[in-house]
């Protein structure tokens, strides 16, 4: 298991670098008005890849073994390397010669210490959000210690960037630009809202329809398609008009409509038409991520675009973890209380009620074993908890909309 975890760390580091680097290359090769369209194409490819990765990996694991899920990536990456070497233009000046001494000097300027403090600090802060309330209680010494360590490590990162780093991995002066801060905040909020919804939708259909994991996951496709279409349309809009604030505001409004519909209409007897209520959520997120990328580029000095883009891509996983953690925390807080109340109405209290609540919270397939009356109230409690989870997504979308309203109404030349 340790070897698998180490491999995932290496793979994730390279994958994250590739995504950010691809975005930087696009901004180098295309006019800013066209960047949104090209970035939306990149998002489409990434979405297709993420959508195919799970089913293909599962198929390989079920047929020839899970190891081939890792071996199979090697020829794909090799093909990508060859393609980049052939197709990408060489932007390095022709007469530039880099000797060993110059290369060594450049290597020494890399802010390895700042990168270490930033990476470990974020890990220490975000890890308790993943395990809190699930693996360990929120007030566990492990959770509190990780939070404290994360704060300390990020403080050391700030000191390193301000005092010691020759070329900071992330110049803190960028945060003096409110457009940069707003762009990061909108990305965090929209991603948190979308991921919170994407996590809850399969659970909803597993509980209310007793759907298999595959069928429940398939209900996410309307949101995925909406995300793709939203990104493509936004790219075309920005290319034609040069305006990016209006899509940012509209994105939050459209997403909010989706979450309101889920709260009001998903009561456990959802029909096929109502299953498309998640489409506006994906559509709004696609609009937002394309528009915010351009808003960030328009607000910064070109020499800062690489680090600014990296910060934007860092905001997305932060939002993902916050969205999952907030949704889970809301479920953990609401569902047991609601279920206990419903069980009392059935005359079930005390140790018997605690046993039912514990089993219902631990596994969805308990619904297949429980008596009909208990299964019904467990389902209702799940639905109530998910309503509050969608409320978190709605709050995030409202925050994103409010922030977008505060951004400058710029227009690209």
Spans of model-derived segments:
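Helix-loop-helix hairpins in multi-pass membrane proteins, especially solute transporters
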Residues: 1-113
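Helix-loop junctions at membrane interfaces in 12-TM secondary transporters
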Residues: 1-8, 264-278, 334-338
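Interfacial helix-cap and linker-helix signal at transmembrane-aqueous boundaries
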Residues: 4, 56-64, 129, 133, ...
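Transmembrane alpha-helical cores of Major Facilitator Superfamily
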Residues: 9, 40-48, 52-53, 188, ...
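Small-residue-rich alpha-helical segments with characteristic i,i+4
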Residues: 49-58, 274-354, 388-392, 405
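Hydrophobic transmembrane-helix bundles of small-molecule transporters
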Residues: 67-185
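Transmembrane core module of solute transporters
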Residues: 141, 145-152, 156-307
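Transmembrane-helix exit segments and adjacent C-terminal regions of multi-pass membrane proteins
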Residues: 361-413
């Amino acid at each position: 298991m340790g070897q698998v975890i180490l491999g995932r760390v290496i793979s994730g580091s390279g994958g994250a670098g590739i995504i950010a680097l691809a975005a930087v290359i696009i901004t180098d090769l295309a006019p800013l008005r066209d960047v949104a369209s090209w970035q939306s194409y990149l998002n489409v490819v990434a979405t297709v890849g993420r959508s195919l990765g799970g089913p293909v990996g599962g198929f390989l694991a079920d047929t020839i073994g899970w190891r081939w899920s890792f071996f199979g990536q090697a020829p794909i990456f090799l093909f990508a390397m060859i393609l980049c070497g052939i197709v990408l233009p060489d932007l390095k000046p022709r007469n530039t010669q880099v000797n060993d001494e110059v290369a060594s000097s450049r290597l020494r300027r890399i802010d390895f210490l700042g990168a270490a403090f930033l990476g470990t600090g974020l890990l220490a802060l975000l890890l308790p959000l993943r395990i809190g309330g699930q693996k360990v209680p929120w007030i566990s010494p492990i959770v509190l210690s990780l939070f404290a360590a994360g704060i300390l490590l990020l403080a050391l990162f700030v000191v390193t960037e301000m005092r010691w780093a020759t070329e900071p991995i992330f110049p803190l002066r960028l945060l003096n630009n409110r457009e940069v801060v707003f762009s990061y905040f909108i990305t965090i909020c929209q991603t948190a809202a979308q991921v919170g919804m994407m996590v809850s939708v399969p659970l909803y259909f597993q509980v209310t329809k007793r759907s298999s994991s595959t069928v429940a996951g398939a209900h996410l496709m309307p949101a995925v398609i909406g995300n793709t279409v939203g990104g493509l349309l936004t790219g075309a809009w920005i290319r034609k008009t040069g305006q990016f604030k209006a899509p940012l505001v509209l994105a939050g409004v459209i997403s909010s409509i989706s979450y309101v519909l889920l709260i009001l209409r998903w009561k456990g007897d959802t029909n096929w038409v109502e299953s498309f209520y998640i489409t506006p959520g994906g559509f709004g997120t696609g609009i937002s991520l394309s528009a915010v990328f351009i808003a960030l580029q328009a607000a910064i000095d070109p020499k800062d675009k690489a680090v600014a883009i990296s910060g934007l891509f860092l905001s997305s996983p932060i939002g993902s973890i916050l969205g999952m953690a907030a949704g889970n925390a809301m479920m953990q807080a609401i569902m047991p209380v609601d279920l206990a109340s419903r069980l009392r109405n059935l005359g079930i209290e005390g140790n018997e009620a605690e046993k039912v609540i514990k089993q219902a919270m631990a596994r969805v397939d308990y619904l297949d074993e429980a008596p009909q009356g208990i299964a019904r109230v467990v389902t209702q409690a799940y639905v109530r908890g998910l309503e509050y989870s969608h409320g978190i997504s709605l709050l995030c979308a409202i925050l994103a909309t409010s922030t977008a309203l505060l951004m400058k109404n710029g227009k690209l030349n």
